């Protein structure tokens, strides 16, 4: 007789094959119809606030894996807090101004931007930025990121621009903004100043030179020496800066020697570096004539090696003895330290390079040459005229523009600066009130602020927020008053910042406005520079978050490691310097870079990149989310097709676990769970293991350790459930009475496991967990519309086993491994086929004597054999033989109790009882 139809092998309709690329868009449509984001806010309104303020990506290209990692982690955070009872508004944002947008449209559209009017060019930039906002928004939505996508903030929106103008005004009135001539990073290709956060360092080959500066005036201190043969020797890696040399810096307390070479020339250099420098110069022998401290040479004059001018000997504590000659080439137009040193000595500022990176007339015969072009020519000229002491080829780390990738120069130009020194202590103190994840972020931020120089906030670009400063034509002084700032802000709110370029200064300023410096009532000009994009993004907490949401500070900022010198820092400086507040975030979390499978940076040119859009189509967004959720993102995160293939296997284990639960919960009513005292010990073991997982998952979500959540749930599915619990449970689920107490005990445990696991994994596997949620039965208090509307469950302590009982179950699991090993050997020896054909004789030591309290039938179920005999002895021993008896035609156990019952042949008592309650089979 065929008994298969009498087994409880129900099917839920939940498919084993995920088909995520096709299924996920359907889920997204369902979420949109549900108005998921707003419904979630309504549900949690009035609860504690968790506000993750979105760091705005540039709207200048399609999604890349860095975007995918970043937005996935943010979504994990907001979803996990929402499911733990928090109100979680999430307003995405975009950074729109600046060189990345300008460069992209010029390159893509081959625009002659210099021939375009400001209005035309800014319109093209605006259109370009809007397009990529749409592209990126569609990608983020496809990933399942929940947020207010219809109302994002944009740094180019009029309301934002107006608030940023007010931020600038506050910082100006606080005395932290000034205009000055100082060396800044300068990109000659793009003709603009750059911030430190816009610099990338690359290893470049370079020619370093040791140059002889003849003694000109020794102040009578070295008159006993032949001045015509006396030289200071300097060292530099930037030959093109030599025309700008005004001084030679020595350390006041270091010893400097006059070293005589065999050729009769005498060279002044640091005593500590004589052997190295003379060796580079090709001198095997030399004589140290005399030694003096660096301060001995102060205010002496040397002649420039190829220009008709002198260089003063000055003192500086920053001079080190680890490289060069100890005599430091000092050009105030090209270096911050150089500038400060020469300023201290009252020397003039000389900048012999123009905006395009060409030498000016000040450089003499090199005028008109690009700096790169002049290097080799100056070198050859010095070789010819004998001023070159030596040269070397080296590879050094040199700054490049982050956008055009060309080498940059350090060049003094008139710029607007934020004086960080004036509020540096307050900014550093503000770091103490932030939770940094990882914890070392605090020291990193504090040290960066401590070491930073003034912030250059002006840019010589057209696509940016105009610096809201006017100039009086009569007295020439800059004007930035509360009245002028509010006039500009009000104008921008109504018409946007393009109005600055379209209107005359008098039409922007209030009627009757007069110069606060000289009282002039007419003749004003507008500043032509725009603000640094980091000032834009650094103002988002005030110009977007506080303005639109009314929240300040945010609960969290979360971005990549590079933002310590970028968005984190600019936001902190704006908050302290402009608003007089502390940090604009309570927590600061960082992630690493995305790299390829070998740990290399991904670049189009290398062909090792991965496209999120292609991953959506091949694997589905949930696999992308699982990649982010399975990776320790505090370090660099690897991605490759092989990694995604492995993740697919992990995903299937979770999905199959859910399917097993769902299939066995058909017709189960979770409103009628068995009472704790009715649950069987094995089921309590499973729930207790679940409780342990729940406790750990809560802690991991608190610490943003999403990879721990993912790995633990995967291990729970594979080790505790599939390999142990489900394996043992199948007989009870399939063969017991459908509504019997033993099967309902198992179903109760399965429901608790599926319910808790689906909620716990929902922040990461958003699509799949919601698919499971829609397929599973629910309790009356559950919101069946979406898993996100339900909080994560607390441990089910009422069903938990004691610690002693759990230790006993640990011993059972160990014994089961021993039994399985013996069964495998018996199968290999042809003693048995399937494990139900086996009878096991098990000997256990005294510590396992608790097993004698269990029936041999229960032990047989645990080991998935037909018969077990148990004895207590000295050590574990397992013997396997073929079970004696008759095979039950329904459950396939081999038992002595199998017999014919009425019309049913060869049934065990359990199966016979079940059959007796079923309708009579035809």
Predicted regions and their residues:
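Residue patterns forming the tRNA-binding/recognition surfaces of aminoacyl-tRNA synthetases
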Residues: 2-20, 26, 30-34, 106-243, ...
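Acidic, turn-prone loop/beta-hairpin segments
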Residues: 95, 184, 188, 194-202, ...
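Residues immediately within or flanking Cys/His clusters that coordinate Zn2+
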Residues: 184, 398, 467-469, 512, ...
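Short cysteine-rich clusters marking metal-coordination/redox-active sites
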Residues: 187, 401, 472, 515-518, ...
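Cys/His-coordinated zinc-binding microdomains
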Residues: 191, 460, 476, 519, ...
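Protease-associated
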Residues: 247, 254-327, 336
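Alpha-helical recognition segments enriched in aromatics with Gly/Pro capping
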Residues: 312, 345-357, 461-463, 482-636
């Amino acid at each position: 007789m065929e008994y298969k139809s009498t087994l409880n092998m129900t099917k839920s309709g939940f498919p084993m094959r995920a088909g995520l690329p096709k299924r996920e868009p359907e889920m997204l449509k369902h979420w949109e119809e549900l108005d998921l984001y707003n419904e979630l806010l309504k549900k949690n309104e009035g609860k504690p606030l968790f506000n993750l303020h979105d760091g705005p990506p540039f709207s200048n290209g399609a999604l890349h894996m860095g975007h995918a990692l970043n937005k996935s982690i943010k979504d994990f955070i907001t979803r996990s807090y929402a499911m733990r009872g928090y109100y979680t508004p999430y307003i995405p944002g975009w950074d729109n101004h600046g060189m990345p947008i300008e460069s992209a449209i010029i390159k893509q559209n081959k625009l002659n931007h210099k021939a375009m009017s400001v209005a035309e060019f800014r319109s093209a930039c605006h259109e370009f930025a809007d397009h990529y906002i749409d592209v990126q928004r569609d990608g983020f939505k496809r990933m399942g990121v929940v947020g207010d996508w219809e109302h994002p903030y944009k740094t180019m929106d009029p309301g934002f621009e107006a608030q940023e103008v007010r931020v600038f005004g506050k910082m100006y009135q606080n005395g932290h903004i000034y205009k000055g001539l100082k060396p800044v990073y300068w990109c000659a290709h793009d003709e603009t100043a750059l911030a430190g956060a816009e610099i990338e360092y690359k290893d470049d080959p370079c020619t370093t030179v040791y140059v002889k500066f003849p003694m000109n005036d020794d102040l009578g201190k070295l008159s006993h020496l032949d001045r015509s043969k006396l030289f200071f020797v300097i060292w530099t890696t930037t030959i093109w800066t030599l025309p700008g040399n005004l001084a030679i810096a020595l350390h006041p307390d270091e010893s400097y020697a006059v070293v005589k070479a065999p050729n009769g020339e005498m060279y002044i250099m640091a005593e500590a570096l004589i052997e190295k420098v003379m060796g580079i110069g090709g001198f095997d022998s030399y004589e140290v004539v005399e030694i003096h401290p660096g301060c001995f040479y102060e205010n002496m004059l040397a002649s420039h090696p190829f220009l008709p001018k002198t260089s003063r000997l000055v003192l500086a504590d920053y001079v080190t003895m680890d490289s060069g000659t100890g005599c430091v080439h000092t050009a105030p137009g090209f270096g911050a330290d150089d500038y400060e040193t020469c300023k201290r000595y009252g020397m003039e500022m000389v900048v012999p390079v123009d905006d395009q990176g060409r030498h000016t007339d000040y450089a003499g015969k090199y005028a008109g040459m690009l700096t790169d072009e002049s290097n080799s020519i100056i070198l050859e000229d010095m070789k010819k005229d004998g001023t070159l002491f030596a040269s070397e080829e080296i590879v050094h780390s040199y700054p490049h523009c982050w956008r055009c990738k060309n080498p940059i120069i350090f060049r003094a130009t008139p710029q607007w600066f934020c004086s960080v020194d004036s509020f540096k202590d307050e900014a550093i103190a503000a770091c103490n009130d932030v939770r940094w994840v990882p914890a070392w972020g605090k020291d990193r931020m504090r040290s960066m602020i401590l070491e930073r120089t003034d912030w250059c906030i002006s840019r010589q670009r057209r696509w940016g927020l105009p610096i809201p400063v006017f100039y009086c034509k009569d007295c020439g002084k800059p004007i930035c008053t509360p009245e002028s700032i509010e006039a500009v802000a009000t104008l921008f709110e109504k018409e946007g910042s393009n109005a600055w370029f379209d209107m005359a200064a008098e039409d922007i300023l209030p009627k009757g406005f007069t110069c606060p410096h000289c009282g002039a009532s007419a003749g004003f000009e507008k500043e032509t520079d725009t603000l640094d994009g980091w000032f834009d993004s650094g103002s988002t907490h005030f110009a977007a978050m506080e303005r639109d949401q009314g929240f300040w500070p945010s609960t969290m900022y979360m971005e990549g490691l590079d933002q310590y010198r970028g968005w984190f820092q600019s936001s902190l400086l704006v908050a302290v310097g402009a608003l007089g507040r502390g940090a604009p975030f309570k927590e600061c979390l960082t992630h690493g870079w995305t790299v390829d499978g070998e740990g290399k940076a991904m670049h189009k040119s290398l062909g090792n990149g991965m496209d999120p859009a292609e991953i959506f189509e091949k694997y589905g967004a949930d696999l992308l989310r699982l990649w982010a959720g399975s990776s320790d993102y505090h370090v660099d995160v690897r991605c490759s097709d092989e990694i995604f293939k492995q993740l697919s296997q992990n995903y299937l284990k979770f999905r199959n676990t859910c399917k097993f639960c769902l299939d066995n919960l058909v017709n189960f009513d979770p409103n009628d769970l068995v009472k704790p005292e009715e649950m069987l010990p094995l089921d309590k073991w499973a729930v207790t293991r679940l409780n342990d997982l729940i406790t750990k998952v809560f802690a991991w979500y608190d610490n943003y350790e999403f990879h721990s959540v993912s790995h633990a749930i995967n291990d729970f599915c594979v080790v505790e459930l599939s390999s142990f619990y489900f394996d043992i449970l199948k007989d009870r689920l399939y063969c017991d009475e459908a509504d019997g107490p033993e099967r309902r005990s198992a179903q109760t445990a399965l429901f608790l496991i599926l319910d808790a696991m689906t909620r716990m994994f929902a922040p990461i596997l958003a699509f799949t967990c919601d698919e499971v949620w829609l397929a599973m039965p629910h309790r009356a208090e559950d919101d069946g519309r979406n898993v996100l509307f339900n909080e994560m469950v607390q441990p089910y302590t009422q069903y938990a086993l004691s610690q002693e009982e759990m230790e006993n179950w640990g011993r059972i699991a160990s014994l089961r491994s021993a039994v399985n090993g013996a069964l495998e050997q018996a199968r290999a020896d042809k003693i048995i086929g399937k494990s139900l054909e086996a009878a096991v004789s098990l000997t256990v030591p005294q510590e396992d004597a608790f097993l004698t309290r269990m029936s041999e039938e229960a032990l047989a179920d645990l080991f998935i054999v037909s018969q077990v005999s148990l004895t207590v002895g000295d050590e574990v021993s397992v013997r396997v033989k073929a079970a004696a008896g008759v095979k039950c035609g329904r459950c396939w156990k081999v038992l002595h109790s199998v017999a014919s019952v009425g019309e049913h042949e060869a049934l065990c008592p359990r199966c016979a009882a079940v059959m007796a309650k079923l309708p009579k089979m035809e």
